[in-house]
Every structure is written in structure tokens, then in C-alpha cells.
Regions:
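Short hydrophobic/aromatic beta-strand element in the GNAT-like acyltransferase core
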Residues: 60, 126, 138
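Glycine-rich acetyl-CoA-binding "A-motif" of GNAT/NAT acetyltransferases
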Residues: 135
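Signal-transmission linkers at sensory-effector interfaces
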Residues: 1-36, 170
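Short beta-strand-to-loop transition segments that serve as allosteric relay/switch motifs
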Residues: 138-147
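Helix-loop-beta substructure at the N-terminus of cytosolic sensory domains
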Residues: 23, 28, 32-74
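A short, aliphatic-rich beta-strand micro-motif
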Residues: 122-130
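Acidic/proline- and glycine-rich, intrinsically disordered low-complexity segments
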Residues: 81-103, 109-110
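Amphipathic alpha-helical "output/dimerization" segments
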Residues: 131, 149-169
């Protein structure tokens, strides 16, 4: 019996290409909406709502905003029960906030740190929105599936965070 290679399955390549094209279309749509938004808060709202609506694999999308020495939930769509405020000096969300790019955890099962913020299963991706003035917000995308995020999802989160950073009052 001969083993089949991916080249023998053109439908796989076609499906991956269509998925990448769709992701790019959604990204452009969100970037345009961010540019047109009258304020940073409105841009955050549009980004969260559009990401949740367009990507079924995203079980929850949350925007955290910097508030003094902590981060506060600005908007959450279908996020599991968890704190509304977290410190920026400890915990998994704080660690993600200090990163220079998106942070991804592919399996949350058994992670005591993430369970403290309400996420016990699946996977999570967190992208900091920062400017030269510092941290402004975080985009948190949670999926109840393990390994839900691809490198393209990470690039999408990175580009959205960069677009949102341009919308901040300090930009």
C-alpha cells in the first residue's frame, strides 16, 4: 500500500489557501474599521466584536485596558467567569502584557496560573497593544480547543495590536 503525500491531496492545499485568504480579508476589514473608529475605545470594541463574529474557533475575545497598576476588562464576549481586574506585576496576563509580541499557550489543562484568571481548558493567545508611552491594552483570544491557534492567527493578533496602537491618544 502506497503512502499518500500532501501533494496527492490538492483539496488540502486549496483549503489552506482559502483559509489564509479569508483570514487576510477579515484582517483588512478589521484594520479599516479601526482606522475609521472615532476613538481608541471604539476601535477596541469593533476589533473584539468582529474577531468573535468572524472566527468560530475563537470561543471568547476579551479586551483588557491598562488602569493604574492593573489591567481591567474593557469588553468581553463569552469569556469564562474570572476576575475583572488583574495586577500588571504578577500572573499570566501580566506576563503576556510584558511580552513584545503575542503570547500563545496551546494547552491550558492543568495550568494553575491561567485557572486563576478563569481559563482552565483549551488554548489562549494574548497580544499586547503598546506604544512608546507604554502598555495601553491587551487582546485576549481564548478557544476551548487545544492547539487552536496557528502561526497565521498569531500574525493576525500582532497586526491588530499594531493597528490599535496607532489609534491610541499618544500615537
Amino acid at each position: 500500500m502506497a503512502l499518500t503525500q500532501d501533494e496527492d491531496k490538492p483539496w488540502k492545499t486549496d483549503l489552506a489557501r482559502k483559509s489564509a485568504q479569508r483570514r487576510e480579508q477579515v484582517l483588512v476589514e478589521i484594520e479599516e474599521s479601526i482606522k475609521k473608529a472615532p476613538s481608541f475605545e471604539e476601535a477596541l470594541r469593533v476589533a473584539v466584536e468582529t474577531m468573535k463574529k468572524k472566527f468560530a474557533r475563537y470561543s471568547s475575545v476579551t479586551a483588557w485596558v491598562a488602569d493604574g497598576d492593573g489591567l481591567v476588562v474593557h469588553m468581553a464576549l463569552e469569556r469564562p467567569q474570572g476576575p475583572e481586574r488583574v495586577p500588571t506585576d504578577s500572573g499570566p496576563i501580566a506576563d503576556a502584557a510584558h511580552a513584545h509580541g503575542p503570547t500563545m499557550v496551546s494547552d491550558l489543562n492543568g495550568s494553575a496560573l491561567w485557572s486563576q484568571v478563569g481559563l482552565t481548558t483549551g488554548s489562549v493567545m494574548v497580544a499586547p497593544v503598546r506604544t512608546e508611552a507604554g502598555l495601553w491594552a491587551l487582546l485576549e483570544v481564548w478557544s476551548d480547543f487545544r492547539d487552536a491557534f496557528t502561526p497565521q492567527d498569531v500574525k493576525l493578533a500582532e497586526r491588530l495590536a499594531a493597528g490599535l496602537a496607532k489609534k491610541t491618544p499618544s500615537a
